[in-house]
């Protein structure tokens, strides 16, 4: 009258000692399988670090050479500008007729306005009148 249960699936029941041994065997096999991939991962991780380190050193050397080239080109492009600024400062200090040297498109600089204000305010009054007229024109549109 014994019917096979789902746990036995028609197999004969075995002694508890045999079943415990199989469980222990399975338990021992699982950690060995799990440890093997971890060890291989550790090996690959340590081998990746020196490669990255070497890559950055090479990259750093390239950047340094590029930086030197960039700095040289920047110095060449900055030097003419600095020379012009230095000359402009010398001219504004030495001459009061700089406004006459300017073309029709160029207006007096802020430094020139400051110099004019120290000499007299008549020039500023004229400038203010012109700016007021231009603002009124824009308001009529």
Curated annotation (Swiss-Prot):
Residues 1-10, 66-80, 132-141 have a biased composition (Polar residues). Signal peptide: none annotated. Residues 11-26 have a biased composition (Basic and acidic residues). Residues 84-103 have a biased composition (Acidic residues). Residues 1-47, 66-141 are annotated as: Disordered. Pfam families: SPAN-X. InterPro entries: SPAN-X_fam. Belongs to the SPAN-X family. This is Sperm protein associated with the nucleus on the X chromosome N3.
């Amino acid at each position: 009258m014994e019917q096979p249960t789902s746990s036995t699936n028609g197999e004969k029941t075995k002694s508890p000692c045999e079943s415990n041994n199989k469980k222990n065997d399975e338990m021992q096999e699982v950690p060995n399988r799990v440890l093997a991939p971890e060890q291989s991962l550790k090996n690959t991780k340590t081998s990746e670090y020196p490669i990255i380190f070497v890559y950055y050193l090479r990259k750093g050397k390239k950047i340094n050479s590029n930086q030197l080239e960039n700095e040289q080109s920047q110095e060449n492009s900055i030097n003419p500008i600095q020379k012009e600024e230095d000359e402009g400062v010398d001219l504004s200090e030495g001459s009061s007729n700089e406004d006459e040297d300017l073309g029709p498109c160029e207006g007096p600089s802020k430094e020139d306005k400051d110099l004019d204000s120290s000499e007299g305010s008549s020039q500023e009054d004229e400038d203010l009148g012109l700016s007021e007229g231009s603002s009124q024109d824009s308001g009529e549109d």
